[in-house]
Amino acid sequence: MKMVSSSRLRCLLVLLLSLTASISCSFAGQRDSKLRLLLHRYPLQGSKQDMTRSALAELLLSDLLQGENEALEEENFPLAEGGPEDAHADLERAASGGPLLAPRERKAGCKNFFWKTFTSC
């Protein structure tokens, strides 16, 4: 009886491991195909592959933003009314209100800053 249950357990374990391996391989293939698509869309200069980190980050961010824009279009979210001028005017109004808290008063010669507090001079 124990032999039957241990063989079933082994079979189940092998099946589970093979399923996990196949899923991880399929996800790795999707990542590689997406990277190949990005590199094909923006070919590298020469054979040196001298694409900088910032350029690669820019490519990935633009692809991410494009995906988010497509998702928003699919969900039919209304776009913000008004143009960039309205947003700029809102930002200016918020900035012109002045600081909410008064700046910290300190003695004229006291400019020392230690950790998170000003030192007493």
From Swiss-Prot:
Keyword tRNA-binding tagged: no
Gene Ontology BP terms: regulation of cell migration
Localization per Swiss-Prot or TrEMBL: Secreted
A Pfam family matched in the record: Somatostatin
Disulfides per UniProt: C110-C121
Gene Ontology cellular component terms for the protein in this record: extracellular space
Propeptide feature: residues: 25-105
Signal peptide: 1-24
Membrane is among the record's keywords: no
MF-aspect GO terms: hormone activity
InterPro entries noted in UniProt: Somatostatin (IPR004250), Somatostatin/Cortistatin_C (IPR018142)
Region (Disordered): 76-99
Keywords, comma-separated and alphabetical: Cleavage on pair of basic residues, Disulfide bond, Hormone, Secreted, Signal
PANTHER family with a match to the protein in the record: SOMATOSTATIN
Family per similarity comment: Belongs to the somatostatin family.
Function, as annotated: Somatostatin inhibits the release of somatotropin.
Name of this chain's protein: Somatostatin-1
Gene: sst1
